[in-house]
């Protein structure tokens, strides 16, 4: 089920502003907004309310054992996060994207489908990297 201000249907059980009605001891909530700043704002609201923000990693995604993935980040099918990457909170690592070794992806970044982030880049907070884009080695220096 989910909360949504615009969508309708059986799975929609309320508006986003109703979130506190669904808070229980073990409740986890993910702010599934495509707008990076809105997602970060909602992450803060949920965190301030002591609601757990899960890490959602698809079974077909690969995350290196030496990589770190922050709370409230989603890693979608066939995405790859290589060695020593730090993915901060609230990011979307979309389908088939590759984050090469040693990258830092700051909070709220959306890496679109099929994107390649080459090694040793620091992608700034709330940036959206468009689908299929290749970010060259050290284009955003660490």
Task: Outline where the language-model segments fall.
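Glycine/small-residue-rich loop that forms an oxyanion/phosphate-binding "nest" at active or ligand-binding sites
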Residues: 31, 35, 39-57
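Structural signal for interior beta-strand "rungs" in well-ordered beta-sheet cores
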Residues: 56-142
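Short, charge-rich binding segments
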Residues: 20-24, 44-48, 66-67
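Short secondary-structure capping/turn micro-motifs that flank functional sites
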Residues: 8, 37, 62-63
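A generic structural signal for alpha->beta connector loops
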Residues: 9, 26, 50-51, 132
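Short, hinge-like loop/turn segments at secondary-structure boundaries
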Residues: 12-13, 48, 72-74
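A solvent-exposed beta-alpha-beta segment
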Residues: 1-33
């Amino acid at each position: 089920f989910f909360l949504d201000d615009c969508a309708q249907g059986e799975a929609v059980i309320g508006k986003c502003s109703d979130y506190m009605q669904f808070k229980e001891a073990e409740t986890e909530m993910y702010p599934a907004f495509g707008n990076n700043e809105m997602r970060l704002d909602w992450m803060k609201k949920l965190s301030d309310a002591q609601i757990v923000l899960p890490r959602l990693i698809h079974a077909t995604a690969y995350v290196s054992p030496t990589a770190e993935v922050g709370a409230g980040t989603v890693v979608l099918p066939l995405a790859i996060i290589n060695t020593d990457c730090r993915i901060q909170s609230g990011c979307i690592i979309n389908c088939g994207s590759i984050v090469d070794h040693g990258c830092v992806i700051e909070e709220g970044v959306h890496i679109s489908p099929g994107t390649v982030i080459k090694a040793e880049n620091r992608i700034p907070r709330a940036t959206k990297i468009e689908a299929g884009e290749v970010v060259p080695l050290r284009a955003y220096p660490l």
